[in-house]
Amino acid sequence: METMKTIAMRQSCREYTGEQLTEAELNTVLEAANASPVGMGKFEDMMLTVVQKKDLLEKLDKAGAKFYGNPDMHPLYGAPTVIITSARDTGIDRRMVGFCNAACMIENMALAATDLGLGSVYLMGSIMALGADAELKKDMKIPADFIPASAIALGATAQPLKERDLTVTKITVDHIK
């Protein structure tokens, strides 16, 4: 297995060529999302929305720029595909489980994209803006009982992916023996 190499190659991509994913690439990424761990196996409480329609990507990009207070910003980075993860609104006590599930799905999709040589970046600001915009949420066909949790932008990267050295020192580790 080459899992650690894929992990070492995965990085946030903020510059895309504009080339759309092939159907096979998209299906591989969606398979990775569907292989993610989901709390209590409640896959019915999760939803993926694949956005490739340019006018909707532009609306989401503008909503994100407004959220950040910078109209010149392009928080989707020109990616031709954005996949939104949404979680069923199961109430405040369980909502965090859906957001954790979404994070696992995003990571699996990012690793699958890396394995395919595609660029990806985890998106939050545009998704927070989406969650606050009922009309845009409706345009994205996200049901009223689902909350946009996170998203991933995907596409052919303008910068080649480079393998990084992996370390155990970036994050504080406390060994309790």
Model-derived regions, located:
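C-terminal helix-cap and adjacent tail motif
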Residues: 5-13, 18, 22, 142, ...
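N-terminal amphipathic, basic helical "cap/leader" segment at the start of enzyme domains
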Residues: 1-81, 176-177
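Small-aliphatic-rich amphipathic alpha-helix that forms the alpha element of a beta-alpha
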Residues: 33, 83, 90-136
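Short, solvent-exposed amphipathic alpha-helical segments in soluble enzyme
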Residues: 65-67, 99-101, 138, 168-170
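Short, charged/polar surface micro-motifs in flexible loops or helix N-caps
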Residues: 53-58, 89-91, 158
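Helix-biased detector of long, well-ordered alpha-helical tracts
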Residues: 17, 86-93, 175-176
